[in-house]
């Protein structure tokens, strides 16, 4: 269960043979789906920045950056400050125009042949992902349109015999009229609802927000317990399949996205 970079961690664990049998369900929040299956998707370029590298590729990129910075041996590297090493990738890119794994930080997994034999996308396309139920989704005003990649992933899981439940969070967060605040259903906004942590925020939450949070918290809990967001009694949220290509839309009413002036949500 993870969101954003945490969602990418879930994807990595799902692709790692060393993690087999260590988890029985997986929730991927705001980490897109498949990138290679939809190369024209607006998220493909973004997700490619986090594409796994081989161990040899990552070592070569690291050496290039260190040599450029004059850190040509271990003594010099160890003498450099943590802050300098941490920022070195960004400095290198701004000066040279070259992007490395050090630019994106430690969120790009390494295909080392041990923990990872292949990328998440390749593992999915080669039917080497963990065969567990999946819940996967994003927010209306996320970092990009993740719907195509998520749909492709769900169809891929259908072919593998796994269930995959897709969702979109489309409730624009309420504001008190102040400027310079995040608006809409932005990246990470759904976490307030999943954890029902409204009391830790200044936003003027409504009774409807509390009700929506209860619905989402129940769905996440049911999925964690039963592998089905509906629970043992069943419900309206069916897996995304070729015959049922539908996302569950979490919002208060049909006017949510229109009123927010942030764009139209997906249709359930």
Specify the residue positions occupied by each region the protein language model found.
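Surface-exposed, flexible loop/turn segments at secondary-structure boundaries
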Residues: 6, 34, 85, 142-143, ...
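Short beta-strand immediately N-terminal to the catalytic nucleophile in serine-hydrolase-like folds
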Residues: 1-3, 29
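A structural signal for well-ordered alpha-helical segments within the folded catalytic domains
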Residues: 8, 56-60, 147-151, 189, ...
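Glycine-rich nucleophile elbow surrounding the catalytic serine of serine-hydrolase chemistry
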Residues: 3-12
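Mobile gating loops/cap/lid regions near enzyme active sites that modulate substrate access
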Residues: 139, 157-268
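Acidic helix-start/capping segments at beta-turn-to-alpha-helix junctions
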Residues: 2, 82, 242-245
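Substrate-access "cap/lid" subdomains that shape
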Residues: 11-15, 20, 25, 29-156
């Amino acid at each position: 269960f993870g969101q954003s970079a945490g969602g990418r961690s879930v994807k990595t664990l799902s692709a790692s043979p060393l993690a087999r049998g260590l988890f029985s369900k997986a929730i991927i929040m705001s980490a897109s789906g498949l990138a290679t299956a939809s190369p024209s998707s607006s998220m493909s370029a973004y997700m490619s920045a986090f594409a796994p590298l081989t161990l040899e590729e990552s070592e070569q990129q690291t050496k290039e950056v260190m040599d450029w910075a004059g850190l040509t041996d271990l003594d010099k590297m160890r003498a450099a400050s943590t802050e300098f090493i941490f920022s070195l990738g960004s400095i290198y890119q701004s000066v040279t125009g070259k992007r490395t794994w050090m630019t994106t930080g430690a969120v790009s997994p390494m295909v080392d042949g041990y923990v990872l034999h292949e990328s998440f996308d390749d593992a999915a396309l080669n039917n080497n992902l963990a065969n567990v139920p999946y819940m996967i989704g994003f927010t209306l005003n996320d970092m990009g349109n993740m719907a195509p990649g998520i749909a492709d992933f769900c169809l891929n899981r259908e072919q593998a015999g796994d269930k995959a439940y897709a969702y979109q969070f489309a409730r624009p967060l309420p504001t008190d009229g102040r400027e310079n605040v995040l608006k809409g259903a932005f990246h990470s906004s759904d976490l307030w609802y999943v954890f029902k942590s409204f009391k830790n925020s200044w936003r003027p939450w409504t009774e409807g927000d509390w009700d929506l949070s209860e619905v989402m918290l129940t769905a996440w809990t049911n999925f964690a317990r039963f592998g089905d967001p509906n629970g043992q009694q069943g419900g309206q949220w069916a897996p995304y399949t070729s015959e049922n290509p539908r996302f569950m839309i979490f919002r208060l009413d049909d006017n949510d996205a229109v009123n927010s002036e942030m764009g139209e949500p997906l249709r359930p």
